[in-house]
Regions:
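Long, hydrophobic/aromatic-enriched structural stretches that serve as scaffold segments
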Residues: 28-76
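Charged/polar positions within long, soluble alpha-helices
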Residues: 37, 188-192, 222-226, 233
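Intrinsically disordered, low-complexity segments enriched in Gly and acidic/Ser/Thr residues
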Residues: 174-208, 219
Length: 263
């Protein structure tokens, strides 16, 4: 999963003739549609465009692909367009969609311990793999999600604290499982209002996770995140990066956007 944040050079764009603007825009729309078109063999292949609010940028592109090579190919394809000459990438984020499996992991570990299976032994590893494979098959729609059609996007990266006094990774599995369960219960109350995609980025980018929230009412983002501020996981262990909010921009509406309109 790749997020690209761009600032648009409006001054340089306005210096072009109407004919040049139209030519560049048409080529950009065609290229973006080509990039978003999924090949038949792709498990997940999507790209979505958003008009960004605030000073951090003007456009957000979100890409979901099967591999980092495919994501890099998207970057290279975009860079070949003349439209790209008017974009300045101010931020990007690379991650992989993942599921929180604290509860199922705790149950699996307990079951293996009850059978006196030595942790990390060959038997242990085989049992863990079998469990993960079974869960992956059952939850494939969550592992390979589609980008929702919701009108608004809120993206932010985050960490779990690992300081000298407060360190998430030094807590026991049982305590982490308990806290994440309570944390998840808050999210479930908003399930009919917001769609969430969590992606992991340890070893891939500067933060540990990326969070994408999709909703048809932007105030839902505020209500959900505010309520979670009082949850132990967030209040005690969470660190948040910058927030990026955008309005869904269908690719064919790029012409209108370049004229100062969302539609």
């Amino acid at each position: 999963m790749l997020h690209q944040i761009f600032r648009f050079n409006w001054k340089a764009w306005r210096a072009l003739s109407a004919a040049e603007q139209q030519r560049i825009t048409t080529a950009a729309i065609n290229k973006l549609k080509e990039i978003a078109q999924a090949p038949a063999e792709a498990i997940t292949h999507q790209s979505a465009l958003y008009s960004q609010l605030g000073h951090k940028g003007d456009l957000i592109l979100v890409h979901m692909r099967n591999s980092v090579e495919a994501l890099n190919q998207v970057e290279l394809q975009l860079a070949q367009t003349e439209f790209y000459d008017y974009l300045e990438q101010t931020y990007s984020y690379l991650s992989v969609v993942e599921l929180g499996l604290y509860e199922s992991t705790a149950k699996t570990y307990s079951a293996l311990a009850a059978r006196d299976i030595e942790p990390h032994s060959e038997t242990w590893n085989a049992a863990i793999k079998e469990t993960l494979d079974r869960q992956a098959a059952a939850m494939s729609s969550r592992i390979y999600p589609t980008i929702p059609e919701a009108k608004y996007l809120c993206f932010y990266p985050m960490d779990r604290k690992r300081g000298e006094e407060v360190n998430w990774y030094m807590e026991s599995m049982a305590d982490r499982q308990r806290m994440m369960h309570l944390h998840g219960m808050i999210g479930r109350r908003y399930a009919d209002q917001v769609r969430q995609i969590i992606s992991g980025s340890i070893g891939l980018d500067d933060w540990e996770w990326g969070v994408d929230l999709f909703a048809n009412d932007p105030l839902t983002f505020k209500r959900l995140i505010y309520e979670m501020r009082f949850d132990e996981v967030s209040a005690k262990y969470a660190l948040f990066g910058s927030f990026y909010v955008g309005v869904k921009l269908p690719i064919e509406n790029l012409t209108a956007w370049l004229s100062g309109n969302l539609a």
